[in-house]
């Protein structure tokens, strides 16, 4: 048998040479000899064929994953935030408004919709930081598609290009302090992967990883909502797996069956990276033209191996790799959302004021009072809010 057949399977499941050798019960020197010869001895055909058959078997599963950028922070060693808005974000014609409070150690924030940019007026060495978190990513994607005709790939290319324009001497003039890639497992009427099984497999010694595993359970109306962490949240990378359907049902106040039928959410698998790990991830994606969803799956598979027992043998877990094994079924997507300038204010009014206003109006119809109208029309607009209207 040609070694290339084994090589394809090894790459697909992100096995290191040592892990592949252990799985085949050979030493690494033997694996290297096979690689150099380009062939595998006939006596190992059955084991390798079982791996290849496993690969083909998971290809046709009903599981599917959809990946997206869900959180990104990019810093530059410059305080010229206007230049960063124009040349990196390409949002130079948008009204970024200054806010007195900053965040992440910065004292000043400029914000447009949910898109944030920070600087420190007291510490020039901090430069500036772009922050796109959750909804901000979806809003920015709207400008990708409707105004810029660009993509996340283009955005990160602009980041590296901008670093070159501001570089002065040695050192790093750009960093990615945070990058989260979210992999959403869509709801499947025929069944989905149950996160509790991963905990059970871990307890039975059938999950191999150098990372620590921690499970958090939250009791609620939908039962125990599970969140599983691999690795420390203080480290350069960690994984967070959780039940997205339950999270959204709580957040939106909707029935979980509606979340399944309309939004198609089930589980989410997040790869969270910081600093050099995030930089290397983006560089690999750009240089090798690998979409970030597939690369995120490769990262998970390189750090976590999941097995099961079959006829006494320890073999790859078919259900897990049906979800995270066949990368050809994994797509990178955008979910652009157009947001009006005062949408946050309208949402706040709807959630916090509309009910009370309706109650007061009913009361005033009974009593004949007219205080509500006076309150609504006598309100003053602050200087900060006048700027939003300019």
Regions found by a protein language model. Give the residues of each.
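DNA major-groove recognition helix of helix-turn-helix/homeodomain DNA-binding modules
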Residues: 40-58
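A short, Lys/Arg-rich alpha-helix, primarily the initiator
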Residues: 1-13, 313
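Recognition helix of helix-turn-helix/homeodomain-like DNA-binding domains
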Residues: 25-40
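Short coil turns linking two alpha-helices in DNA-binding domains
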Residues: 16, 27-30, 338
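Secretory-pathway ectodomains
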Residues: 4-6, 23-26, 50-52
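Short alpha-helical "recognition helix" segments of helix-turn-helix
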Residues: 19-22, 342
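Structured, helix-rich domain cores that form ligand/interaction pockets
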Residues: 55-340, 348-390
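Helix-turn-helix DNA-binding elements, focusing on the entry/boundary residues of the two helices
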Residues: 6, 17, 339, 346
């Amino acid at each position: 048998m040609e070694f290339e057949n084994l090589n394809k399977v090894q790459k697909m499941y992100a096995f290191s040479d040592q892990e592949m050798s252990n799985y085949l019960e050979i030493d690494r020197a033997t694996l290297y000899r096979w690689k150099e010869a380009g062939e595998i001895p006939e006596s190992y055909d059955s084991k390798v064929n079982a791996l290849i058959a496993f690969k083909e078997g998971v290809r046709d599963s009903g599981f599917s994953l959809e990946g997206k950028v869900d959180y990104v922070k990019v810093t530059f060693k410059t305080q010229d935030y206007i230049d960063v808005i124009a040349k990196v974000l390409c949002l130079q014609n948008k009204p970024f408004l200054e806010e007195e409070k900053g965040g992440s150690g910065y004292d000043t924030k400029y914000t447009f919709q949910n898109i944030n940019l920070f600087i420190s007026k007291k510490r020039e060495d901090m430069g500036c930081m772009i922050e796109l978190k959750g909804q901000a990513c979806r809003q920015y994607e709207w400008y990708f598609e409707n105004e810029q005709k660009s993509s996340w790939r283009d955005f990160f290319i602009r980041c590296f290009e901008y670093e070159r324009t501001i570089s002065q001497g040695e050192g790093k003039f750009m960093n990615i302090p945070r990058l989260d890639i979210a992999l959403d497992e869509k709801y499947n009427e025929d069944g989905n992967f149950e996160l509790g099984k991963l905990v059970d497999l871990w307890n039975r010694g059938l999950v191999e990883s150098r990372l620590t595993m921690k499970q958090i359970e939250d009791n609620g109306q939908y039962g125990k909502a599970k969140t599983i962490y691999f690795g420390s949240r203080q480290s350069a990378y960690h994984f967070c797996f959780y039940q997205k359907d339950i999270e959204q049902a709580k957040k939106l106040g909707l029935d979980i069956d509606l979340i399944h039928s309309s939004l198609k959410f089930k589980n989410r698998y997040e790869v969270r990276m910081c600093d050099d790990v995030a930089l290397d991830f983006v560089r690999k994606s750009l240089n090798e033209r690998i979409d970030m969803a597939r690369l995120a799956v490769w990262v998970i598979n390189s750090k976590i191996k999941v097995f099961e027992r079959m006829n006494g043998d320890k073999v790859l877990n078919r259900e897990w790799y049906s979800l995270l094994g066949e990368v050809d079924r994994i797509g990178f997507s955008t979910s652009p959302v157009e947001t009006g300038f005062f949408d946050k204010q309208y949402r706040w009014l709807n959630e916090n004021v509309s009910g009370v206003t309706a109650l007061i109006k009913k009361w005033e119809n009974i009593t004949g009072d007219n205080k509500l109208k006076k309150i609504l029309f006598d309100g003053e607009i602050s200087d900060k809010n006048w700027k939003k209207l300019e």
